[in-house]
Regions:
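Sec-dependent N-terminal signal peptides
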Residues: 5-17
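A generic "folded-domain core" signal
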Residues: 21-130
Length: 130
């Protein structure tokens, strides 16, 4: 009987590990950023994410906002900037602001992406300066 229980537990552990094989895996943290890798079946995806340090007003109730910078080597995508604000966007166009710089984004559901690759490069440059 004990042997049967051990075998069932080992099989369960195998399937649990297999089911979680494609979950994003944290690679490390640097200041307010955390980096992850993930395999979507087409290839490895690497991304960094950060969450706001401060939220206003204090009683703000919604899922946390996140800013992502993603690399998809198999699709030749690098420095793809996206954001989720924890809610569905009401409009299809979104504006991200950093200092005096404004960046146009398009949204789908609760995510938004920069429209223009040149703006992505400019936003990455702005973020590196900050």
């Amino acid at each position: 009987m004990m042997k049967k229980i051990i075998i069932i537990n080992l099989i369960s552990l195998f399937f649990l590990n297999f089911a979680n094989a494609n979950d994003p895996k944290s690679v490390g943290k640097f200041k307010n950023w955390e980096t992850f890798t993930y395999d979507d079946g087409k290839g490895k995806i690497c991304f960094a994410q950060t969450i706001p340090i401060e939220r206003s007003p204090n009683n703000f109730v919604r899922k946390p906002s996140r800013l992502f910078v993603t690399f998809r080597k198999s699709e030749k995508i690098r420095d793809e900037v996206s954001v989720t604000s924890g809610h569905e966007y009401k409009s299809s166009s979104v504006t991200a602001t950093s200092g005096k710089n404004e960046f146009s984004m398009f949204s789908q559901g609760n995510f938004a992406w920069l429209i223009d690759r040149e703006e992505e490069a400019s936003l990455i440059k702005t973020m590196k300066k900050a």
